[in-house]
């Protein structure tokens, strides 16, 4: 350990390295980095004195130091935190000098103050980093926790800053604001030796962001040196909620051992994953495969899935449990009432209905005051929308604003969001009269293959690995998780085996017909018969994917999935 640390201090000092927090706030990261490096340096100098006496040390201990405060830089947009960061760095330096004096009997004299950390009070995205941070003879280390703003929360001004950071040709759709710091760091370190790491929201390693973000990073010769998978971080700032974060560090050194840390749950302790060789963009030990959005399924045997229908109605086309009896008592509205199922209804077994008026008699509103009131409410809601396309639909208040899958045969429903705690994705069968909302995806499934695939451990592993998240919950998408699922071509034997295994799952559920899917798949309360049925399904699915037997771990499945994806997309 001492040799390793000695090497670190030597590189830091003799090569004249700079260390920079590109979003330093009040300086916490800089303070910790400087304090820890000074602590290590003091331990090494004290150890050197114990082993050799004072003969190898200078009379002025500052001549033996390699960690200097003036090689630390920070950028903070607000004046007050920037001043706090400056002061805090001086105090940390003072404390480190006291520790050095206690260990060696002397410390550098800092008064009057001649050197200190450089803290720029500036917007990091408009500051010229190469000018603000002079190129050293040694290495440059960049780190920080840039602002957490998603695709849907950034302003037009922030979008312009992102475009400037990435360049005019970069497609920014879905990219988080935080990725602007990745772009500027790539530019800064293009002609410098160094490494970098950021704390970011976990969304950058989910869904369609990894392909857009990591492609230019990997193309520039960078690889992931270390990473912490998703964990919850409670901000200490007033009014700030907990966010789900990842930490990713990058290096261009191919010989550096990759280190990956995981958390059993978002607020748990970090545990290092043993035997890691390569960390890919999804923070998995595996090849650097990037899963792109697709408009059609990669797998030849999978049909397309379609999300359901969205009313944009201020609740006027939806019938709640409390309203149901009154609506059904209206002879005009009753024929148009159909079950309306969103993700909550699908998973928890709750009931809700809608007025499906696609074939409505044009005279119907004149014969039902309640129907007329509801349709007028829909028209008024749409007329005041900011979206011109929605305002246009005020002319058709009896129709859902977005019409998704509506089937005249039974079909399968998959919730858009499901708890990460469940071992399996809760998939449902629906009769043709059911209208699914835009929070459910549907697909025709005449032979049970869709149900079998979506209900397997292989698929939920894929979803956990490359899919998006809502906080820590799993988010299903047609373009990434479904269309990108690397299911090889099925033989007739495969299809028959999957259909039989899917039927066993349904039979196990039928043993407890009153249970909701949430109850069937309660993480700590699954029925043994249902677990056994899913084990049987997994044995079939895992073998189809290339495993010699049912996989025992998520890692085994991830390795198969990425290998199959690389094979099918090569």
Where on the chain are the PLM-derived regions?
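Class I S-adenosyl-L-methionine
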Residues: 1-67, 77, 81, 123, ...
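Flexible, glycine/threonine-enriched loop-and-boundary segments that flank and lead into catalytic domains
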Residues: 1-18, 59, 107, 111-141, ...
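Non-catalytic DNA-recognition/assembly elements of restriction-modification systems
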Residues: 24, 370-378, 394, 487-570
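Signature of N6-adenine DNA methyltransferases within the class I
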Residues: 31, 38, 82, 90, ...
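Extended charged low-complexity segments that act as oligomerization/scaffolding linkers
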Residues: 62-68, 115-118, 240
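Conserved SAM-binding motif I beta-strand of class I
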Residues: 72-75
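Conserved SAM-binding loop
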Residues: 85
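Polybasic, glycine- and aromatic-enriched phosphate-binding surface used to engage nucleic acids
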Residues: 179, 256, 264-500, 504, ...
């Amino acid at each position: 350990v001492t040799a390793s640390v000695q090497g670190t201090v030597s590189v830091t000092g003799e090569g004249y390295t700079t260390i920079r927090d590109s979003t330093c706030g009040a300086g916490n990261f800089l303070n910790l980095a400087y304090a820890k490096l000074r602590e290590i340096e003091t331990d090494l100098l004290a150890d050197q004195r114990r082993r050799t006496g004072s003969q190898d040390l200078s009379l002025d201990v500052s001549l033996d130091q390699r960690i200097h405060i003036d090689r630390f830089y920070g950028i903070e947009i607000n004046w007050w935190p920037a001043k706090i960061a400056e002061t805090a760095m001086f105090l940390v330096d003072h404390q480190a000098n006291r520790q050095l004096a206690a260990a060696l009997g002397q410390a550098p004299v800092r008064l009057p103050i001649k050197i200190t950390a450089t803290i720029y009070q500036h917007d990091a995205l408009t500051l010229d980093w190469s000018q603000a941070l002079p190129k050293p003879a040694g290495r440059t280390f960049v780190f920080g926790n840039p602002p957490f703003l998603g695709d849907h929360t950034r302003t037009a001004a922030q979008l312009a800053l992102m475009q400037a950071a990435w360049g005019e040709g970069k497609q920014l759709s879905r990219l988080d604001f935080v990725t602007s710091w990745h772009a500027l760091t790539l530019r800064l370190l293009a002609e410098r030796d160094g490494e970098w790491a950021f704390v970011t929201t976990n969304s950058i390693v989910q869904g369609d962001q990894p392909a857009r973000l990591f492609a230019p990073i990997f193309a520039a010769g960078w690889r992931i040196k270390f990473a912490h998978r998703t964990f919850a971080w409670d901000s200490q700032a007033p009014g700030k909620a907990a966010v789900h974060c990842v930490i990713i560090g990058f290096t261009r050194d191919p010989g550096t051992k990759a280190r990956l840390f995981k958390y059993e749950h978002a607020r748990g302790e970090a545990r290092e994953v043993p035997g890691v060789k390569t960390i890919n963009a999804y923070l998995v030990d595996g090849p650097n495969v990037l899963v792109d959005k697709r408009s059609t399924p990669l797998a030849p045997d999978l049909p397309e899935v379609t999300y359901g229908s969205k009313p944009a109605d201020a609740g006027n086309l939806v019938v709640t449990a409390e309203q149901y009896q009154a609506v059904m008592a209206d002879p005009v509205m009753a024929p148009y009432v159909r079950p309306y199922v969103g993700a909550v209804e699908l998973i928890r077994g709750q009931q809700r209905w809608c007025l499906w008026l696609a074939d409505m008699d044009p005279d119907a509103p004149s014969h039902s005051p309640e129907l007329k009131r509801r349709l007028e409410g829909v028209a008024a809601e749409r007329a005041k929308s900011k979206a011109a396309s929605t305002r246009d639909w005020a002319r058709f208040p009896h129709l859902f604003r977005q019409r998704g899958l509506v089937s005249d045969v039974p079909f399968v429903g998959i919730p858009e969001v499901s708890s990460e705690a469940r071992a399996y994705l809760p998939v449902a069968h629906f009769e043709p009269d059911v209208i699914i909302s835009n929070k459910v995806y549907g697909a025709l499934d005449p032979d049970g293959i869709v149900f079998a695939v979506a209900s397997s451990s292989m698929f939920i592993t894929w979803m956990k690995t490359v899919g998006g998240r809502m906080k820590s919950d799993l988010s299903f998408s047609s373009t990434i998780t479904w269309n990108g699922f690397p299911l090889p071509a099925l033989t007739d034997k495969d299809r028959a085996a999957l259909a039989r295994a899917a039927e066993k799952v349904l039979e196990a559920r039928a043993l407890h017909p009153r249970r909701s899917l949430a109850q069937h798949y309660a993480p700590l309360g699954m029925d043994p018969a249902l677990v056994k049925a899913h084990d049987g399904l997994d044995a079939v699915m895992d073998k189809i994917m290339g495993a010699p037997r049912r996989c025992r771990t998520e890692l085994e499945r991830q390795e198969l999935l990425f290998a199959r994806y690389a094979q099918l997309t090569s």
